[in-house]
Amino acid sequence: MFDVSFTELIVIGVVALIVLGPERLPKVARTVGHLLGRAQRYVHDVKSDIQREIELDELRKFKQQIDSTAQDVNQSLRSATDSLRASGDSLRAELDDTARTVNEAAADIQRTIAPHPAITAETDTSKLPGTPATLPATAAAEPTPAAPAASQAEAPKSPSTGNAT
């Protein structure tokens, strides 16, 4: 602590022995030892208090940094949540508009397809304008020109042997 060498201690002891005498020297040495011990303990306590305050100060700074970072993260999460909610609300509004348009179009189609009250199952459809009259029976029975060509293509061919039969 004071950086005193052994030779310096011997010199101090000899001077104390001469000044104090052999009767009082042990008592004074004991008292000086107790005082030095108290001083060392006091210095140690002050050092530890200062060290604790420094650590507390560092911890406070660290806590403040963590708190500010947490607030920044919380703020960014809130802004992201708000923007997502706004996007979701706009999408919901667009989907509602689209659904309304589709429902209106479906209702228009249903009104267009629904039979008019004047037309019923009992009404003769051949008398309606734009409906062709009944087809003649001969037209339905006649084969189309593509049908004979197909039947000729399907007929098995006899192998030609070169002999005319």
From Swiss-Prot:
The lineage of its organism: Bacteria, Pseudomonadati, Pseudomonadota, Betaproteobacteria, Burkholderiales. Keywords: Cell inner membrane, Cell membrane, Membrane, Protein transport, Translocation, Transmembrane, Transmembrane helix, Transport. One of its GO terms (cellular component) is TAT protein transport complex. It is a single-pass membrane protein. Coiled coil: none annotated. PANTHER family: SEC-INDEPENDENT PROTEIN TRANSLOCASE PROTEIN TATA, CHLOROPLASTIC. Part of the twin-arginine translocation (Tat) system that transports large folded proteins containing a characteristic twin-arginine motif in their signal peptide across membranes. Together with TatC, TatB is part of a receptor directly interacting with Tat signal peptides. TatB may form an oligomeric binding site that transiently accommodates folded Tat precursor proteins before their translocation. Residues 67-84 have a biased composition (Polar residues). Pfam families: TatA_B_E. It comes from Bordetella avium (strain 197N). GO terms for biological process: protein transport by the Tat complex. The Tat system comprises two distinct complexes: a TatABC complex, containing multiple copies of TatA, TatB and TatC subunits, and a separate TatA complex, containing only TatA subunits. Substrates initially bind to the TatABC complex, which probably triggers association of the separate TatA complex to form the active translocon. Residues 127-159 have a biased composition (Low complexity). The chain crosses the membrane at residues 1-21. It is found in: Cell inner membrane. GO terms for molecular function: protein transmembrane transporter activity. InterPro entries: TatA/B/E (IPR003369), TatB (IPR018448). Belongs to the TatB family. This is Sec-independent protein translocase protein TatB. Residues 67-165 are annotated as: Disordered.
